[in-house]
């Protein structure tokens, strides 16, 4: 499944129309509108999302009790093969390993990956970047 998201609902200054026109002209599909955005074709969607502060290692700590679904029901793989706990770590700050160098099951079972998921279950993130993530605050 592929889901594109425009993370600017309510504050797009009209730019969503420009982005939407561009995508419709470059991605073939039926583009059926629904409550979350559009179903472009089977297993291919565009969704709207509320704006938030992206995680930044230099940002202030957002809170000590933080929950997130990172490593609990998803993870990310960057274009260079770096595995990260979520797609918001686009810089690979929390580098769990590399799929071009080791097996993904070994990476996901590593002590660091396990600590991340256990930390979120306890609402006590093991990673500094996660404590500075504005997106995670919506779950906390």
Mark where each language-model region is.
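Cysteine-cluster motifs in flexible loop/terminal segments that predominantly coordinate metals
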Residues: 124-140
């Amino acid at each position: 499944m592929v889901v594109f998201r425009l993370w600017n609902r309510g504050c797009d200054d009209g730019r969503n129309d420009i982005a939407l026109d561009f995508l419709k002209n470059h991605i073939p599909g039926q583009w059926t509108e629904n409550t979350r955005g559009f179903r472009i074709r089977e297993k291919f969607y565009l969704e709207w999302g509320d704006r938030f502060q992206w995680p930044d290692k230099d940002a202030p700590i957002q809170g000590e009790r933080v929950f997130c679904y990172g490593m609990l029901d998803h993870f990310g793989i960057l274009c260079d093969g770096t595995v990260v706990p979520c797609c918001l770590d686009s810089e690979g700050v929390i580098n769990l390993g590399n799929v071009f160098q080791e097996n993904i099951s070994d990476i996901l079972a590593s002590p660091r990956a396990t600590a991340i998921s256990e930390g979120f279950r306890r609402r006590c993130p093991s990673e500094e970047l996660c404590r500075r993530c504005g997106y995670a605050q919506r779950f906390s």
